[in-house]
Amino acid sequence: MSDRDNKKTIDKVLSFLESNKGQYVSGADMAASIGISRNAVWKAINELRSRGYVIESITNKGYMLSEDNDIISAEGIESFIGPKHGHMAEHLLVYDSVDSTNNKAKESALKGACHGTCIIAARQDSGRGRRDHQFYSPEGGIYMSVVLLPDKIPFSKNDAVTAFIGVAVCKAIESLTGLKPVIMGINDLYIDGKKICGILIESGSEFDSGILQWIVAGIGINFDSDIKKFPRELKGNVTSLYPPGKGDMSKNRLIAKILENIDVLAKNSEKDIKKEFTKRRVEK
């Protein structure tokens, strides 16, 4: 089996386990559903375990992907995206670490990436905020950048897009956690007076005509980040949705909800988005 075929097999096994997360599935059923041998299933399971996935196994019951797993994966995100928004899961690129998800997304946009293409990383080595300020991006966070095409959203000015993304993230956090984040200024989300999320919007235009070609929306969320390890100058000003390793939901689920919200809100008018934004905005 080639490396490419092996990767496809592993991805299919992971996708099957994600869609049955928390319950046992037999190796025979998995093999039949995917169209591979039971031996190939066994090899894929071992490879996934070596990557850190907690997969339990019991004789005569099969395999179960533990609910405790919180590894970001395209398969995991896709398992939480509803059928109406399936196209938002067609171009997910997940990395353990990148310099900047916005940089990766811009590279993809310049190569003609589709609307909704999403770059996601567990860590950024050179994360950026507005005015090129450093955005501290350790493990425990969600770092994602979405490519948006102007003909797919009802507005194109950076501030309007920032508001649109801010509302999408707020609504996702509200619906999944019950928390009520507010938008401080225009591009930062706060909970209980401390920053939980930053947003960076960048765009590219055709040189001769100045016509907008693409927009990249960068989102950085402290999910279950260890705030104690943040730089001293940040510790008192930031918070995390959950304590380290104790999230009540998976990162994949929150990412999926944000992508669904982007898809839904893109069909709204700028007036409607502004109304939702204003409800959540507070002055610094």
Task: Write out the residue ranges for each language-model feature.
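N-terminal lobe of the biotin/lipoate ligase/transferase fold
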Residues: 2-174, 197
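Long, positively charged amphipathic alpha-helical accessory segments at protein N-termini or as interdomain linkers
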Residues: 2-36, 50, 151-181, 191-284
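Short loop/edge segments at beta-strand edges and connector loops
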Residues: 96, 183-185
